[in-house]
Amino acid sequence: MSPFSERLRALRLRYGVRQKDLAEAMGFEQSYVSALELGIKGPPSRDFVDRLARYLRLSADELAGLLSELEASRRHYTIPQTASSDAYRLCGELWRELDLLSDAQIRVMRQLIETWRRGPVKLGDRPVLGRVMRKDKEGTEM
């Protein structure tokens, strides 16, 4: 299930709206709303999101969260022409292994990316990913 699917279902349930009523009010089929919630259909158009926001009277924060999940749910990406051959290989390897990765492995990769996003890691820095590293025995008094 995509992040958008999860958010759509959560919003619909929070506002107490049936799929049929939501779809009808927005001008869509109930089967389309169901397919979106199940992740069978790819992310919808911005028009769908705007109609949903108007119908549910979403707050600015709720709409921003929904748009963030819409972006996170993209299924197709284009590798930039300026990417290195290693970047192409990495994308291909990740694509081939995607269905085989556990949730824990995905979390570790996302934590790594977040670490890089925060800034360059200096030589000797050891980022901690999900656990505390023990001090070396050297330098400890006995």
Predicted regions, residues:
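Interfacial/linker helices and their anchor residues that mediate assembly or domain coupling
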Residues: 71-141
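A short, Lys/Arg-rich alpha-helix, primarily the initiator
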Residues: 1-14, 107-108, 141
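Residues within the helices of the helix-turn-helix
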Residues: 9, 20, 50
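Recognition helix of helix-turn-helix/homeodomain-like DNA-binding domains
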Residues: 27-43, 51
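Conserved hydrophobic/aromatic packing and binding residues within compact polymer-binding modules
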Residues: 8, 22-23, 33-36
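DNA major-groove recognition helix of helix-turn-helix/homeodomain DNA-binding modules
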Residues: 47-65, 71
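The alpha-helix within a helix-turn-helix
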Residues: 12, 23, 53
